[in-house]
């Protein structure tokens, strides 16, 4: 049940420090008298209702447990008309604490001879509407903390009003209980039983304090009220519906030293470890936390109006509504986490508090506090941790170096461990049903058994074969081992030139769909096809060197000399043994290279033959010219070429001219032969040879230059 304040967003309690000055709100006498009259009227109405029901023998209507009519002034808690404390279970917190020896929120006592404590139904709960003065600072007495005075229309009176109520106030309930005769004894017994159950050691001291306060009660009501504040039960309405109590400095000390007080879900989620481990391991550091948090509390209490913006900042950072108590708990928990930074850290909480630092700095500028709240938090972080890496961490998160100049005067260590997230170690697990397993090698016996099972059952029932085979082998493993290793249809080793030519044709047809390529080849697997294709492409991209050409030609000449069939598969293996290149040559590439080398040799031979023909033709022309120029003594004295006609000197001149004209028109090579030779050499892609016209003598009809005419 959350307390709702109509006039402000201030939570149920302000927390004051030891240095704050006591200030009490002033009320007029008329207001005090009005409140007294209202209380008397309420009591009279209650008595009339009880008498009316008693005469009519009608059971009284059940009043809401939280209604103001059931407030017993003598006890200060909800009770019945028999002066027996009737405390509903919803009012008790989840845990009890030991503050100054008095249980502030005691657990329900074991009333064996009294009425049974019952829970009130949800529809009967009516929470009193509480109001609080926004401008009144918290009340402090003798350096001890106390909650702010509350004004209420339901029976909770203010401090000044309590001083004038003849010791019938709710705040003096414990002292007045000790004055009554029978009722006091019952309550003493009940409280002593509760204290023994809850192990409260300072029970007797508290009773003595109560008696001393009761003796001085009639003399000075104001002092009595202030002294009884040490034992008052302060009701703080939590979000869960239970009421928790805090009064003294020990309250804050216990609040900030134990995570058990994190009754709210928001604060308990921020606790990483149990409260016991914190208290046992870091008992010495709790005092440092309390000391470091007091200046922060002092500044909040001394600055009027700053509580609401601070709570708003906390609610914005944590994205939830928060009270002052929860705010201080979060600050203390953060300091604990900083202490435990060497062991464990929660990054989410650090981000929250660094956002808070930035916003609180702007708030200090608005209230002209010179960043005092901001600086005190930074000082507390650095001093408690005492490490250089904490200073670096603060700088990385937006805190300036000027704000950390005080660290130069502090001796800092460098022992804290860096915040490192451990990488998850990935483990390889079984591949059965989608999970990877360790490698399961095949033995010779398993391979032989697989061959037998395949011959018996065929190459399709792999699950059946795997179950019969055993050894942890799956159906997929059996199928792959059969198709890639044991099948007699699959070839192993290097490819010949015919297979490689077929491979390139099928790749042009199907692309890189290796299953379809392997289906058409039938003698190679898809993996073999893929490997051979890329190997051939990489081999073609590298140029041949002279050493490789020599090895290739020597190997082929040896094969021809031994009358062996030329196998380029063996030639490629021979080249691979030489290790002239990183990538071995394929059989098809060796074949294409040999054809290239052979064609160049043929072209060179043709070139040599052509040169011999041209030289012979030039020699014949020279012989013809020599026969024409030199005269012969007799026709049989010198050999006469067949192309030269026999000329008689006794022939008439006209016949000689006709013979000379016929002789000039004769050519050594016909035109058709020249065209055929030119076409032959032009058709060759490697070397082209053109017949020069200069090698063919062409004779023109010139009478002046004719040697026969000169005779």
Curated annotation (Swiss-Prot):
The keyword Lipoprotein does not apply. Residues 24-50, 158-187, 198-235 have a biased composition (Low complexity). Disruption phenotype: Cells display an aggregate-less phenotype. InterPro entries: Homeodomain-like_sf (IPR009057), Myb-like_DNA-bd (IPR051575), Myb_dom (IPR017930), SANT/Myb (IPR001005). GO terms for cellular component: nucleus. Residues 540-598 form the Myb-like domain. SUPFAM superfamilies: Homeodomain-like. Pfam families: Myb_DNA-bind_6 (PF13921). It is found in: Nucleus. Its main location: nucleus. Residues 113-139, 148-157 have a biased composition (Polar residues). Residues 24-70, 113-235, 598-640 are annotated as: Disordered. Residues 462-486, 514-538 bind DNA. One of its GO terms (biological process) is aggregation involved in sorocarp development. Keywords: Activator, Developmental protein, DNA-binding, Nucleus, Repeat, Transcription, Transcription regulation. Residues 428-490, 491-542 form the HTH myb-type domain. Transcriptional activator that initiates multicellular development by induction of adenylyl cyclase expression. This is Myb-like protein B. It comes from Dictyostelium discoideum (Social amoeba).
């Amino acid at each position: 049940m959350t307390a709702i304040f109509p006039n402000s967003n201030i939570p149920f309690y302000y927390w004051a420090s030891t240095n704050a000055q006591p200030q009490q709100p002033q009320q007029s006498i008329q207001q005090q008298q009005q409140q007294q009259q209202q209380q008397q009227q309420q009591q009279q109405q209650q008595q009339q209702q009880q008498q009316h029901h008693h005469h009519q023998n009608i059971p009284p209507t059940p009043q809401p447990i939280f209604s103001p009519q059931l407030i017993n002034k003598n006890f200060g808690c909800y009770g019945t008309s028999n002066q027996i404390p009737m405390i509903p279970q919803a009012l008790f917190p989840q845990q009890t604490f030991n503050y100054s020896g008095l249980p502030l929120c005691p657990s329900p006592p074991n009333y064996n001879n009294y009425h049974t404590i019952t829970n009130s139904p949800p529809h009967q709960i009516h929470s009193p509407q509480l109001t609080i003065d926004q401008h009144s600072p918290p009340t402090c007495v003798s350096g001890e903390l106390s909650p702010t005075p509350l004004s209420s229309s339901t029976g909770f009176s203010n401090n000044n009003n309590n001083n004038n109520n003849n010791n019938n106030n709710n705040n003096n309930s414990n002292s007045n209980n000790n004055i009554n005769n029978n009722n006091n004894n019952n309550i003493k017994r009940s409280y002593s039983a509760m204290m023994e159950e809850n192990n409260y050691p300072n029970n007797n001291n508290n009773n003595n304090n109560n008696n001393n306060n009761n003796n001085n009660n009639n003399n000075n009501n104001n002092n009595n009220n202030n002294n009884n504040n040490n034992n008052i039960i302060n009701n703080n309405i939590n979000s869960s519906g239970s009421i928790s109590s805090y009064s003294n400095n020990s309250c804050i000390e216990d609040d900030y030293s134990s995570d058990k007080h994190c009754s709210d879900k928001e604060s308990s989620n921020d606790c990483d470890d149990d409260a016991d481990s914190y208290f046992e391991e870091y008992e010495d550091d709790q005092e440092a936390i309390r000391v470091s948090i007091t200046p922060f509390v002092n500044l909040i209490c001394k600055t009027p109006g700053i509580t609401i913006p601070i709570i708003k900042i906390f609610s914005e950072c944590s994205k939830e509504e928060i009270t002052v108590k929860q705010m201080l708990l979060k600050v203390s928990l953060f300091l604990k986490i900083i202490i435990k930074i060497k062991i464990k850290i929660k990054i989410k909480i650090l981000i929250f508090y660094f956002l808070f630092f930035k916003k609180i700095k702007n708030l200090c500028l608005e209230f002209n506090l010179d960043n005092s709240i901001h600086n005190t938090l930074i000082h507390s972080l650095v001093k408690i941790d005492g490490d250089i890496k904490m200073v670096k961490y603060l700088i990385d998160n937006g805190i300036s170096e000027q704000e950390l100049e005080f660290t130069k005067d502090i001796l800092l260590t460098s022992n804290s461990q860096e915040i490192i997230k451990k990488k998850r170690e990935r483990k390889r697990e079984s591949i059965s049903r989608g999970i990877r397993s360790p490698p399961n090698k095949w033995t010779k016996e398993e391979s032989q058994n697989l061959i037998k099972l395949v011959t018996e059952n065929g190459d399709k029932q792999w699950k059946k074969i795997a179950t019969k085979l055993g050894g942890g082998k799956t159906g997929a493993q059996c199928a792959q081992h059969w198709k890639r290793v044991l099948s007699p249809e699959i070839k192993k080793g290097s490819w010949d030139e015919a297979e490689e030519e077929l491979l390139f044709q099928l790749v042009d047809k199907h692309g890189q769909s290796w299953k379809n390529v392997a289906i058409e080849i039938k003698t190679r697997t898809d993996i073999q096809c893929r490997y051979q294709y890329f190997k051939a492409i990489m081999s073609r991209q590298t140029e041949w060197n002279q050493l490789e050409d020599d090895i290739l030609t020597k190997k082929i000449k040896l094969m021809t000399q031994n009358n062996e069939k030329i196998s380029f598969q063996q030639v490629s293996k021979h080249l691979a043994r030489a290790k002239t290149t990183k990538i071995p040559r394929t059989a098809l590439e060796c074949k294409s290279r040999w054809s290239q080398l052979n064609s160049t040799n043929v072209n060179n031979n043709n070139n040599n033959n052509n040169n011999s023909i041209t030289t012979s033709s030039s020699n014949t022309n020279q012989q013809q010219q020599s026969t024409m120029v030199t005269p012969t003594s007799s026709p049989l004295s010198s050999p006469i070429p067949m192309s030269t006609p026999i000329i008689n000197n006794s022939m008439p001149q006209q016949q000689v001219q006709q013979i000379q004209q016929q002789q000039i028109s004769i050519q050594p090579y016909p035109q058709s032969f020249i065209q055929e030779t030119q076409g032959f050499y032009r058709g060759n892609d490697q070397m082209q040879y053109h017949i020069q016209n200069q090698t063919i003598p062409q004779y023109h009809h010139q009478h002046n230059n004719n040697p026969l005419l000169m005779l």
